[in-house]
């Protein structure tokens, strides 16, 4: 019996030490597990705003055959947007890059080669960003200030490298899933259901039904008082913080 008590006491002591080290708090009859963890660095998923400004964005990597239709729809509805392009897309379609910027839209970096950025070293990450940034700026004559990680893949290292280069890392809070070749109606329904003031919508310039879905998105949202702006006009540039859900808020 004495041996059993000694073993039980040892186990209890070990558990107590573990809990204290891990940051576990004990509160009477229930144990509240609050493991202490370092705060993860996050990109901007959305912005806390009450003015009904939102942003629609298009990732550009593999083609351009629907880009004219996208631009026509935005011109018809007087909508501004942001394109995130990889370097090889901009170099393959320089006329589209110039056309996008010429119509008042944003053209920002989506990396040089579309890798999984979290798998790269710091030097490799910075090479991807500096090369693509320089290529876009050379072709368009417009400064690049935003970066969207390919595949939405990032870690603290990726975010830190982007920030050190003066780039705001951008994600999204509304995924249209247009890359799955959903119908225009289904794409629009997803967006309309999820959008709110300060939302950033993810789409792709080469989605099969993306261009067709735009009037179904623009019409209802504009009628409800929403305003589509470029992401660089949506986000706060200073005196801000990012909540754990990726929402950028003013301090």
Where are the model-predicted features located?
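Terminal accessory/targeting
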Residues: 1-57, 72-81, 197-251
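Short, mixed-charge, low-aromatic patches
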Residues: 23-30, 50-56, 84-90, 143-149, ...
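Active-site beta->alpha N-cap acidic-glycine motif
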Residues: 30-120, 124-138, 236
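Catalytic domains of cell-wall/extracellular-matrix polysaccharide-remodeling enzymes
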Residues: 69, 91, 115-251
């Amino acid at each position: 019996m004495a041996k059993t008590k000694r073993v039980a006491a040892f186990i209890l002591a070990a558990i107590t030490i573990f809990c204290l080290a891990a940051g576990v708090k004990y509160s009477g009859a229930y144990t509240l597990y609050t493991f202490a963890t370092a705060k993860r660095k996050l990109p901007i998923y959305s912005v806390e705003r009450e003015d009904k400004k939102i942003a629609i964005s298009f990732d550009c990597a593999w083609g351009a055959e629907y880009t004219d239709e996208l631009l026509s729809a935005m011109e018809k509805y007087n909508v501004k947007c942001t394109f995130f392009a990889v370097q090889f897309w901009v170099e393959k379609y320089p006329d589209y890059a110039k056309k996008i910027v010429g119509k008042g839209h944003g053209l920002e970096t989506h990396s040089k080669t579309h890798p999984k950025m979290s798998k790269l070293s710091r030097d490799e990450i910075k090479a991807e960003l500096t090369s693509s940034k320089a290529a876009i700026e050379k072709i368009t004559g417009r400064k690049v200030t935003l970066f969207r990680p390919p595949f939405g893949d990032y870690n603290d290292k990726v975010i830190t490298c982007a920030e050190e280069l003066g780039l705001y890392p951008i994600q999204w809070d509304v995924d249209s899933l247009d890359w799955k070749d959903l119908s225009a109606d289904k794409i629009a329904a997803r967006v309309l259901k999820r959008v709110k003031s300060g939302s950033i919508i993810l789409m792709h310039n080469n989605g099969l039904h993306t261009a067709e879905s735009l009037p179904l998105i623009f019409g209802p949202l504009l009628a409800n008082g929403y305003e589509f702006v470029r992401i660089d006009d949506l986000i706060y540039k200073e005196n801000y913080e990012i909540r754990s859900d990726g929402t950028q808020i003013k301090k």
